[in-house]
Structure formats: structure tokens, C-alpha cells
Amino acid sequence: MSSESRENEVKAETKDEIANDGSPQLNGDNNIQSSDGHNDENEESLSRKRDSSGATVGDLKQEEKESMPKKEPEPTVKKIRGSGMPPPQQKYCLAIVRQLKRTKNSAPFKVPVDPIKQNIPDYPTIVKNPMDLGTIEKKLTSYEYSVPQEFIDDMNLMFSNCFLYNGTESPVGSMGKALQEVFERQLKQLPDAEQPAAAPVKKSKQKSASTAPPRTRRNSSVSSTSASVAASTAPKAASPAVLPEGKPRRRKNNSQMRFCSTVLKELYKRQYESFAFPFYQPVDPVACDCPDYFDVIKEPMDLSTIQSKLNKNEYSTLEEFESDILLMFNNCFTYNPPGTPVHVMGRQLENVFKEKWEARPKFDDATLVKQQEAETDALFDNGEEEEALMSEEEINGAKFAAVDKQISMLQDTLEAMKAKKMNRMRKPRRRDLTKEYGPITYAMQNELAERCNYLSAEQLSNVAEILREEMPWLRDTDEIEIDVGNMKPEVFHRIYRYVCKPDADSSEPASPVLMPTKPEKKKGRVLSETEQAEKIRRLQQQLDRFAGKTSPTSPESNNAANVSDSESDNESESSESA
């Protein structure tokens, strides 16, 4: 074998080894060749070169290539921002999580559970796969979910962990159930995957074949890649059947629905919140303490339900929208009689609606035809989806706050009615009586105590009523002790004016106290304790005599009484002469 043929053989072996390694190679013209095939001319030249045994070098290398395991090229999958989830679904799921984190029931679910900080060391042994809203949001922002079902599974895992560890009746379990209801309500409007644009069948096949990943995805409500391939290969006549059902579509009377949306947003304005909040969400018979509501109202309606129907394009005419608004007001007026706070609020909101509704423009047939020609049946863009989602979420998020506000307002109204009733029963107080009449002296106290002994039954009843008004804790007692020394200044002055100076205060409906003329002479002298006791004993004896009783009294006591009377009379006369 010549040296020239030997060199060619070595070169051919080198080229084959490079080709087996899968790296690019250069031919004689410096053109890049892929590892999948050889140049036809090069293969023919190699087949002509034989070794000393008569075997073809190209045949030997071909056998080696066939015996080696073939490396299948990995399919190149083009993902959107690193995720298989379409952008509308990605954006909607992220908006759901962020809205849930803003609700008041999301506090236990915002961050991962810390068993040490929360003093629940058995949590990791019970909950094997913890999950929280913060982790789900992080996975959404890093595009770790390929289909919405993976996101839904993580949300359901979070709620299942809550119910597993806390139960459904505990405070945390109740918060989890409320949060799950909001999530499931918002999930119903999850948009479907974007459908491929209308294109020739061959191009759609090539595109779907090059971008479809070979792995199997979970079943979900969203159309998968295989479904999109089937839709692209289906006849054009069957294409409307595979359009997403849950996706809102533009109505041909879009201008009318836009006006309805404007009116509804007007009713949600802050300036009408004081009388519009009872209509923001459906009536809760338990929270509003009206268990017979659904027995009276057969078709309940509220603004949040109307907003939801408007977002789903369930209204086709203005009359349908107006009918639901009027139904809401009629329900209010049917259940709440005239004069009640909710009835008055309903009338105020109805006037606002009528004012806005009368200003609606005229939608003639020619205008609708032009709109039908100008507008397409394309799906909502992402901005409109997010706006509709946020409006729905804001309504749902304000549900509990509005209910609490309504209950608080009704309680305040009840307290105001009770206070008004009590004010009618009370008489106006006179303040600053201490400054007006001066300090309370010991002589004033003795005078009041002495005059109270001569009050009639009606006057004593009036004094007791004054004490009950000034001292509420005495209202439930039948017997009231008049303690002159421990009275408040305003109470003392009021009773003192009533008993001792009935003519000085014309506002008090008091009759003058009938007092005997003799005790007036003793005004300048204060009796001692012994004299007061003796006087009480004498009065008791007089009462017994009037009642027909005879009390055994010793002559010594009678003499002592006569002596004390003469002494007291002499002292009083001497004080008057002085």
C-alpha cells in the first residue's frame, strides 16, 4: 500500500471519529457539516479505500456506528419566560394570590408556618408537605408552574394542611374556609390558553411538532399542547367548537354594556358609600340577624352579583341590566318597611341610579351596525382581564368589612334610640350648683335632715325620684336611705332647694313643705345629740297616743321631759332676745 493511500486512510479515520463525537467538522471547502451525516463525495472516496485485508474502511466505521448507542437529540421547547403557562393564565393566577394576601383572613397563610415561633412542635410530624401563599407567589414569579393545575394543586394543598392540623371549626380553620371560598369563586374566571392564530395546516403542524414537549402533563381545565395540535389539524368548520368557553368575548352591543359598567362604578363611588354599603354584597341572614330573609325574598340580588354578570357578559341589553338593579331595590323595599334605616338608604341609592340612568345616550340600530362592523369577536386583552379581575376581587375583599360596618351601624342606631329614650325620662340637670349656691355648711345639712322628718309621703316620693335620677344604682332598690353627709354637691343642692326653698326653683314641680311654726324659733340653735334623742322619744309617745296606745312611762321621765322642755324654751327665748 502506498504512503499516499495510507495518509488518506488516516484522514478518513480521523474524520469518522470526529463525526462520532457529535462535534462539527470541516470539509475541504471549509464548510461546517453537522454530526448527523457525511458528505456524499467523502463517503464515496472512503468506500474506495480498502485496507490490506480487503475490507472497506467506510464499512468498518459504519458497523461501529451502528453498534454504538444512538443519542437522541433533546427537543428544544420554547417556553414563555421560562414557563409553560400562557401569559394570561400566569398573570391571572398571580393576581389571585396577591389579592388573597390582601384579605383579612389570609394572615395565617402569608408565610410558612414556624413551629418554634408559634409553639407547635408537632406541626412537621402531622403536615408532611407545608405550603403557603408566599411560597406560591414566589413559584409564580419564577415561572415554576407549567400548567394552572399545578398552581391549583398547591393552593388546595395549603387548605388541606390547614384543615388537617386545625380542623374546620377552629378560628384558623374558619379563616381557611372563607379564603378557600374566595379562591374558588375567582378561579371560575380563569382564562383558557391562547388559541393558535389562523394559518395553513402545514405550518401549524410544523410549529406544534417543534414546540410540543415530549412529557405528559396533568389534566386541567386549560387546553394542553396535544389539544392545540388536534385543533390545528381539525377542519376549519369545526374550529368554533374548540374555542375556550370560559373566556369572555366582546359583545356586539359593547357600547351599551360599557354604559352599564359606568353606571355601576358610579354606585360604588366613595361619596355614596354611607348609604350604598348594604347593597355591595349578598345578604347574609346570619350576620344581619334576619333568618326569614329568604322566605320573603325569593330572588335576591346585589351589586356584586350584577358586577359579576356584567364581567361574564351575561347581559345582552340595557333592559336586562336595569331589571336586575330594580329587582335589588324592590327586594330592599319589600323586606324593610318604610322608615327603617335600610329602606331610607335604598331610596337614596335608587335616586342616584335613576339620575344616572336617565342620562343614558340613545343607541339606534345604525350605531349598533357600525359597532358590529368595527368591533371583532376577539378575546379580551390582558389589561381588560386584569381590570375585570381586580374589580371583582375588590368587591369580594370588601365583603366582610361591609358586613361589619352594617352591623356596627345598626348597633349604633339602637344605642342612640335607647339613649334618646332615657333622655326623655330624665330631667335636665343643673350644673355648677356648688358655685351658684356656695359650699355646703353643717347648718344646711342639719336643716335638711330636720325638714325631711316632716315631709309628706308624696314629697318623700319626689325626693326618692331625685335620688334615683342622680344615682342610677339606686333605681332597682325599694328603700332609699337619705344620707345628707355623703351626698354629691349637685344632689344635695337639688334636694335642699326642693325641701327647704321650694319657691326659689320654679322648674321643680314641688309643693311647699308644710312645717309647724314652732320649730322656726329654734333656727338659731342646734340641738345636741341627747336633746335630739329625747325629742324623738317624745314624738314617738305622741304618735302612740294618737294611735290609741298607752306606753308606761315613769314620773321621773315625765319630769325630766318637762324640765328639758322648759330649759329649751328658755334658751330659745334668750337667744331670740339676744
Curated annotation (Swiss-Prot):
CDD domains in UniProt: Bromo_BDF1_2_I, Bromo_Brdt_II_like
Biased composition (Basic and acidic residues): 1-18, 37-52, 60-77, 526-537
Region span, Disordered: 1-89, 192-254, 504-578
InterPro entries: Bromo_Brdt_II, Bromo_chromatin_reader, Bromodomain, Bromodomain-like_sf, Bromodomain_CS, NET_dom, NET_sf
GO BP terms in the entry: chromatin remodeling; DNA repair-dependent chromatin remodeling; regulation of DNA-templated transcription; transcription initiation-coupled chromatin remodeling
Domain NET, chain residue ranges per copy: 430-510
Record GO cellular component, one term: chromatin
Keywords: Activator, Bromodomain, Chromatin regulator, Nucleus, Phosphoprotein, Repeat, Transcription, Transcription regulation
Acidic residues biased stretches: 566-578
Record localization: Nucleus
GO molecular function: chromatin-protein adaptor activity
Compositional bias of kind Polar residues: 22-36, 550-563
Modified residues (Phosphothreonine): T225
Domain Bromo: 84-190, 251-360
Function of the protein: Component of the SWR1 complex which mediates the ATP-dependent exchange of histone H2A for the H2A variant HZT1 leading to transcriptional regulation of selected genes by chromatin remodeling.
Subunit comment: Component of the SWR1 chromatin-remodeling complex.
Family stated for the protein in its record: Belongs to the BET family.
Protein name in the entry: SWR1 complex bromodomain subunit bdf1
Organism the protein comes from: Schizosaccharomyces pombe (strain 972 / ATCC 24843) (Fission yeast)
Chain's gene name: bdf1
